Every structure is written in C-alpha cells, then in structure tokens.
Amino acid sequence: MKGLIARFIAGFALLLWAWDMVFPWQQLMQAEENRYNQIQQRKILRVGMVNHPLSYFIGAEGTAGIEYELAKSFANYLDVRLDIKTFDNSEQLFSALKDNKVDIAAAGLLYQPELSKQFQIGSAYYSASWQVVYKKGSNRPYKLSELEGDLIIPAGSAVLPILQRLKEDNPKLSWQTTNQFTQEELLLQVAEGKIPYTVGVSVDISAAQHIRPNIAVGFDLTDEAPVLWYLPNSSYSELQAAVLDFMNHANETGLISRIEEKYFNHLAHFDYVDIQSYLKAIKLVLPKYQSLFEKYCGDLEWQMLAAIAYQESHWDPNATSPTGVRGMMMLTRDTAERMKITDRTSAEQSIRAGSEYLHMLMRQIPETVPKEDRIWYGLAAYNMGLGHLLDVRRLTRQLGGNPDNWLDVKKNLPLLAEKRHYSGLKYGYARGFEAFQYVENIRRYYSSIINHQRVEEQQIQNNEEQPSVPQEISKESDSTLKE
C-alpha cells in the first residue's frame, strides 16, 4: 500500500540477510530438523490464522481473505497442500508457532522488534499502523495523555506488547482486556458509544468505517510498519528463503497488486455523509426490494445486484435523469425496448431487465478475462457501452498493458476522455473517468452490504448470548503477555 510494497520486499530481503549475519542461526539449534524439509516430506503447509473480515473468513463463495489467498498461492508455489489452523487471537497463534503446531503465522501481523527476536520473519506485502479510535462527535484525543478513560483491547491482541512499552513513558496509560469481543466488535462498540476507545490496525479501521462511519481515528499509536508472516525460530533458513522468493514472485507477477485491489483499494474513498445515507437505506429501503434482487441476480450475488441498483438510483424506482434514463436500474428507452419491458418505473421489471442486460454484456467479454474480474468489465460496459470497453482494452494493449488484467484496464479508463488517445479509437470519446468511479462505488457499496449483514447477524447473537461489556473486561494495565 501507498507504493511501499516493492520497497518493503527489497528492504526486508536486506534486513533478513543482515539479521542472519548478526545472529548465526546455525550455531543455535544444530540438532533441529529442517522445517522446510518437513513441509516437503509431509506435503502439507500448516498456516495459523485468526478469523478476520479482511485476512481470513468463510464467505458466500467459500474461504477468502488476504492471508488465505497468499497462503494458498504459497502452498501451490511449494506444490503442497494447504492446512489452515485457526486461533482465537495472536497470543494463541504465536504460542502454536513456538510449539511447532504451525509452520507460518499469517494474520495481518505487523512487524514488531520484540517478536523478530523470537521468530524468523518473512517479507512484507503491505503496510499499516496501529491507531486509537473514538466515537465521532465526542472529544477527540490527539495523544495518549488526552485519553479520558481506558483503552479496551481484545485479550491476546498483538498490540499489548506495544502498550506495555508505551506505558514506560506514559505511566498513566491504562487499558482493559476482554475475552468476549473481537477487535471488530470493539470497533463497533466505540461507534455505538458503549466503550470510549479501542486500538485497531489502520486497514481494519478503514473497513469498519464503511459499516459504522461514526468510528473516527484519534491518532496513530505507532508509525506505519510492514505486515508480514512470522516463521519459527530456526537454525535453518530454507523456509524463510522460500517465503522471500515467493513474495518476490507474487510482487513481480502482480498477485499482490490483485489482492490489494480486491480487498483494499475500494476502502480508500470514505465519504461520511454518503455512507450514513447508504446505511440508512440498507435498513429502511433495501428490505422492500431484497426478494427481487435475490430472484433476478442470476450468476451474481444478490448483494452485487443491489449495489448496482443503489449506484444507479439509490433504490428509487421512479428515479429519472436529465438524459432520459429512468427507473431502479436507470435504463434507456432503447435498452428497455431491447429487454422487452413495458414500464421502466416498475421495480421488478427494471431489476430483471438490468440484470439480464448486464449478463448479456458479460457474455460478450472475451473469455481470456479471468472469471473473478468479468463483473468489473461488465459494469464498465453497463456504464459507458460495450464499444468503449473494447476500445479501452485496445488502448491498454497499445500502452503495453494486459487487456485481461482489470488493474491495467481500470487505470486507462480516464484516458478515453483525452483527445490524444480517443482520436485513434473506433468508438471515440467516452467519459471513462465516470466509468472508473462507477465501478469503484459499486465495489464499495457491495462490500458494505456484505459486512453490514455479517455484523448485524453477529450483534444479534451477541445480544442474545452475552452480558454487558463491563462484566466482560478485566484490568490489564500492569499485565504482560505470556512468553
């Protein structure tokens, strides 16, 4: 992220070499069996993870998450099977790594000097920081001394050693830990005013703000640091070298960029008013039309079709634009006639026709485009026309990019409005910058629906099963993590 990935990978390669020079592992544990050889012999790579809405989760289409996709690719790189082992928190995960129960710890873990003394480290694949959050509208803290209450932290959190270190210079700093709530749940409780503050990783906070925009960042608790894998402390470096080689390969082939695009890029834009309006519409308007989205979604998830409709009309079946498009899916008169609908203001007819038209466009996209990216090509065509989509593919090829790579195509969409580019294209000028934003908005709306539903279901369970927050937290200001 922020253009640091390549520099982190190169920098950490140098750091790992220097670390081995200072601490010659071969003198530490001569009798130890080679972990890399163990993986190859058993043909299984054991990776420890923590359930998390960005790193590792089971979604509607199966297992997903940044860490899962990277680990799966690494297992394929080694030609072994991936075995995911899940843990409740980082403390349990690192304990399992010490006890040889997993080969790699992968859970959105930031680099910490203390941990690098206990474990080998892999190379970075993005960067983040720990941040203190508070409820928007309440007094904003700008530094630790301005906190008007305790930080509430999940038990076993990776931030605890950092807090213990900061307490040396800030003796009044105090926090409480809870075994009952995850980091995401604590972020939501801050938004609801149930607790004053918590600490989260910057990318997690960005994701949470799209379902609870009242979450606000007070200040950075740490500088931005690389996110990486941790490996067992070992006298051998083959596994560490394999991870480094794989991450270089993943960077060079665009795998890391594709994962970043899938999970992060749509989070970059945050509009408090827009998100507030959208979340209100999810609660009050979406239930009226959800059954229609489910009925006509076809090969798409119904939440994706709903996100498209919100981008088009804010779920208003009577919406009209100055250009003459109308209805829930904002269809032109020609498209309506083509899709055989008689009333563009009928929510059902509009949703059915819009879905069928999008599916028709997607079927005309070249088969060389990967399955997971076809929806983005289809949406761009839905917005500006199939001809202009084919034009931007040609332009992407002319500029040395890959027309089957959505990242390459997306960045060239705005060029369709520049004369030096569109003058040589078959279909000429197009408002490609609008198509770019159109797709990004839908990605964001889709993600918000998915996460909003997940959080609502989780909170219903919590309200039924769990007592109030004060009964579930314990004072931990003087505690230390178990070694």
From Swiss-Prot:
LT domain: annotated span: 269-483
Bilayer topology: Peripheral membrane protein
SMART domains: PBPb
GO molecular function, one term: peptidoglycan lytic transglycosylase activity
Function (record text): Murein-degrading enzyme that degrades murein glycan strands and insoluble, high-molecular weight murein sacculi, with the concomitant formation of a 1,6-anhydromuramoyl product. Lytic transglycosylases (LTs) play an integral role in the metabolism of the peptidoglycan (PG) sacculus. Their lytic action creates space within the PG sacculus to allow for its expansion as well as for the insertion of various structures such as secretion systems and flagella.
Stored PANTHER family: MEMBRANE-BOUND LYTIC MUREIN TRANSGLYCOSYLASE F
Entry domain remark: The N-terminal domain does not have lytic activity and probably modulates enzymatic activity. The C-terminal domain is the catalytic active domain.
Protein's name according to its UniProt entry: Membrane-bound lytic murein transglycosylase F
Source organism per UniProt: Actinobacillus pleuropneumoniae serotype 5b (strain L20)
Origin organism lineage: Bacteria, Pseudomonadati, Pseudomonadota, Gammaproteobacteria, Pasteurellales
